[in-house]
Curated annotation (Swiss-Prot):
Residues binding Zn(2+) 1, per UniProt: C47, T49, H69, C177
InterPro entries noted in UniProt: ADH-like_C (IPR013149), ADH-like_N (IPR013154), ADH_Zn_CS (IPR002328), GroES-like_sf (IPR011032), NAD(P)-bd_dom_sf (IPR036291)
Quaternary assembly: Homodimer.
UniProt organism field: Oryza sativa subsp. japonica
Compartments, as annotated in UniProt: Cytoplasm
Protein name: Alcohol dehydrogenase 2
Cofactor: Zn(2+)
CDD domains, alphabetized: alcohol_DH_plants
GO terms for biological process, alphabetical: formaldehyde catabolic process
Top-rank taxon: Eukaryota
């Protein structure tokens, strides 16, 4: 492309400080360096993680910053050493990478790349410790190696999944974080068998994606657990057969669930990050074969407390990161599930706005009115 090797000026939504509305600014995006790729973003979605680090409550504030990590785009140019991607390729940026060379990447059991694992505090490129974004010469920090709230961004090649160019980027863009995290937690880690019972704790976008995994796995009963009763109606679209609000019961929710299922759930997936929900998720599964999977991220001071007899009675507790998907290896296959109409991504996308209205997307999520709001970069 004619822009290869040159600085590109484009629009980006800059977070200048915590909790303040994002500002659409003209930024300069430098060419990609070794093992980097410059991507033209066509669609980007808002994930709760973006909101979390924009609020910066209890987090290291890294500002000014370009947030965003769920997106779909096209390769504009590649840096030295990049052989797997070429200009014109369709890609999904991912907040965690796959170098394909470390012990984790070589292991069939792990997706936690040593080199490119998520780093929320690093606001620069891993290669040279510098930003590729500037405004009038002043550096603007990156976010989790992706920074997709920009018409162009620079990303390490290991954090880009090359996908089928026929796949609609305005739909499959949501696969690059939340959906895959929840869906993979069920199908790759909990692995319910056809006819089994599954409980999902937390019915936000990640929880509903986990529920979709249970539905496609043929679960006979899917119990949604949430403190907001308004979420049950929406959850029915994702296969939810029963709804439990812990506030409606005088006894602990795990006891309620054990009674409902004649001894406990076959599988349970926790998607809230609340430590009490995590413990309940484990304690509600059936002894002998029950499997609980933790997806939500707890606070740094949380401690998981349960009686050791739960383990001796052969209940299994697992954790997962990004649904146990290796980004470059596995995401193209998840895209193909959508192309074969086995995944229904449309029901997760509740809103769509032009990129210029990005603050509307933040408002919708803060009010709890959206699952995913996709922003169109060309408007």
């Amino acid at each position: 492309m004619a822009t290869a090797g040159k600085v590109i000026k484009c629009k980006a939504a800059v977070a200048w400080e915590a909790g303040k509305p994002l500002s659409i600014e003209e930024v300069e995006v430098a060419p990609p360096q070794a093992m980097e790729v410059r991507v033209k973003i066509l669609y980007t979605a808002l994930c709760h993680t973006d909101v979390y680090f924009w609020e910066a409550k209890g987090q290291t504030p890294v500002f000014p910053r370009i947030l965003g990590h769920e997106a779909g785009g096209i390769v504009e140019s590649v840096g030295e050493g990049v052989t797997e991607l070429a200009p014109g390729d369709h890609v999904l940026p991912v907040f965690t990478g796959e170098c394909k060379e470390c012990d984790h990447c070589k292991s069939e059991e792990s997706n936690m790349c040593d080199l490119l694992r998520i780093n929320v505090d690093r606001g620069v490129m891993i290669g040279d410790g510098k930003s590729r974004f500037t405004i009038k010469g002043k550096p603007i920090f990156h976010f989790v190696g992706t920074s997709t709230f920009s018409e162009y961004t620079v990303i390490h090649v290991g954090c880009l999944a090359k996908i089928n160019p026929e796949a609609p980027l305005d739909k499959v863009c949501i696969l690059s974080c939340g959906f895959s995290t929840g869906f993979g937690a069920t199908v790759n880690v909990a692995k319910p068998k056809k006819g089994q019972t599954v409980a999902i704790f937390g019915l936000g976008a990640v929880g509903l994606a986990a529920m979709e995994g249970a539905r496609l796995s043929g679960a006979s009963r899917i119990i949604g657990v949430d403190l907001n009763p308004a979420k049950f109606e929406q959850a029915k679209k994702f296969g939810c057969t029963d709804f439990v609000n812990p506030k409606d019961h005088s006894k602990p929710v795990h006891e309620v669930l054990i009674e409902m299922t004649n001894g406990g759930l076959d599988r349970a997936v926790e998607c809230t990050g609340n430590i009490n929900a995590m413990i309940s998720c484990f304690e509600c599964v059936h002894d002998g074969w029950g499997v609980a999977v933790l997806v939500g991220v707890p606070t740094k001071d949380d401690v998981f407390k349960t009686h050791p007899m739960n383990f001796l009675n052969e209940k299994t507790l697992k954790g997962t990161f990004f649904g146990n998907y290796k980004p470059r290896t596995d995401l193209p296959n998840v895209v193909e599930l959508y192309m074969k109409k086995e995944l229904e991504l449309e029901k997760f996308i509740t809103h769509s706005v032009p990129f210029s209205e990005i603050n509307t997307a933040f408002d919708l999520m803060l009010k709890g009115e959206s699952l995913r709001c996709v922003m169109r970069m060309d408007e």
